[in-house]
Amino acid sequence: MRDGSARPASPRLGLADAVSIIVGIVVGTAIFKAPPLVFANVSSPVTGLGLWLAGGVLALVGACCYAELAAAYPHSGGDYDYQRRAFGRLAGFMFGWAHLSVIITASIAQMAYVFADYAGELVPLSERAKLGVALGVVLLVTGANLRGLVAGKNLQNVLTVAKTLGLVAVIAAGFTIYFAMPEARPAAAAAERSASSPAIGLAMVFVLYAFGGWNDSAFVASEVESPHRNMPLALLAGLSAITALYVLANLAYLSGLGWIGLCASDAPAAELVERASGASGKVVVSLLVMVSALGAVNGMALTGSRVYARLGQEHRLFRWLGMWDEVRHTPARSLIAQAAVSCFMIGLVGTDVGRASVDQVVGWLGVHSVPWSDGGFDVLVRATAPVFWFFFLLTGIAFFVLRHGDGATRRPFRTPLYPLTPILFCATCGYMLYSSATYAQGLVLIGLVPLAAGPLLYWLVDRRSDSDQHLTS
């Protein structure tokens, strides 16, 4: 491996590759787990479907904002670049540090363990074996991306096609039950239940969680061919396709299981497959979820590593992350660092020693009980989600700052219905920040502890180089 370049390679990602990354990251495991939680908190099936459609519309609202930013500033790192330009070097540093220490690495760890958990549905696995499988997933995906951008994108394309076809098969199973198997069709619900606004608000949280991750595609904007054209197209086409898949999947769940049956189901996709074909739905859906989780891990590993590479190019503390492999056109050191932190997190919440260490640290901060019985990796998601939404909101605010403060930059794509569109995007992020922080309660401190080290690192080491000339991609 030769690390002779501090800049990303020439563009090697086409429009289809960019769409594949978006679909691959967003369509993870939530569409198989969230629907019962959504429909249990609404007053009618129509309301539930409306929330899924509204979630897609809100995601598209955000995508319109990112489309303008990505087309105007098609640089490596995405949000890192936007926030640095809008708020200064410290803001960019904090975004990169947050993603390395909390956001992307925790998401990779969580998805890797989901893969291991569902592998345990196919083959009996001890907790130690699941831990090994999760670590293996991170190392496997990292190894594939270390082979180069082409290898990483090819793996992403295969996994995205596989998970999309699998989800289409689940959708087909639901409609088959409704139209071709009337004897298996669920009986209509006798009455509707009432749901208060807070319940609908909670349902919306689950919906928006299922749409999360699409913004990661902006991290690789500098490697996309004709980014001024293809980044807006990829964002809008990718999220439109995801919205259609999600609405159809939920309609299929309702068609095959009924509203009451869906609310009561722990595994709606598995039940649909079993009713429609008689095959073991548990096996089929476990394989599908594993493919979905693997695709999400690969997409996050591919895109996230570009953020740390950009961090290394501009901040001497992380300069070692900023070098690119000239031969394979990939930020190898960033990929390795990302894998190391993700594996550390798997060990931290997946072992008794790690959980005891977390208990001790949060105990010092006044949180006396971490609900490990809910699942260690669910705790990880709850602890880090507020950090994600905070930085997402900052990008929304950066949109306004850059639109008004950098009017000289050409904008090949302009967000429609300005300023309503970015205001709605910021409002959505603010609502999710509040909701996720309320849901996490004291657990949010787990995510804030590593984040709090960021300003200290910056002021002790990096602020003296503010006037230096730094590399930009």
Question: How should these model regions be labeled?
Answer:
Residues 1-13, 367, 396-421, 439-473:
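Terminal cytosolic tails of multi-pass membrane transporters
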